Amino acid sequence: WPVMGENADTGLCGQPVMRCKKPNVGAEYPITTIPTSDDFSSDKLGLQWQWQANNKEEWYSLTENKGSLRLYSEDLKTKEDKYLWNLPNLLTQLWQAPSMVATVKVSMPKGVGNNKAVLAVIGQKYGYVALSDEGIVEYCNGNFKTDNREWKVTDKCVGTTEAYLRLEVISCTNSKVASCRVSYSVDGSDFISLGEFECMQGKWVGAKFALACVGEKGGYADFSNFLVV
């Protein structure tokens, strides 16, 4: 079986390393960084994106609204199914730095509050900011390390179904815990803070940014200009 990282203790699992020799792939290639930001101008998702579960083509489209990623809601029956930790159609991206800011523009058709566009930091402890199709911004937390639940912290009516959502990683306590700040804007310039939360790594990998549309079957949201700085 392959061993991840280095086999520091023979017979046990490998451990991560800061540097590793590149494999011989038959040619020389320049060192490049893994992409983070995405303008969704391609007709294929970049390799930096990972689905929470085995993906389905009906979960997203890069052609319905060119220059945007359209994510569709799944027909999930219970409240617990719609918790982000349990959501299969969650599009995620591993963190590439200990501090950074992720911002995305979201828009969706007006509705009655059954669907919402989500920007999240997902892990065993997580948080997210979402815009509902009623024009309400929500800030929610989840804890699947001890409590196995998700709850709303606060919400605010903004009167529009188009807004900018932002998550800022402001500090890392250690390799497993970090603090994040949640905010939103209706014009892309003036961001209003909704609070801060503590996040944790996932079960097998570190914390990740995540995008999703949560709600009823047939609902959708468009995401554009995903920017990480």
What are these regions (language model features)?
Residues 1-229:
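Extracellular glycan-recognition regions
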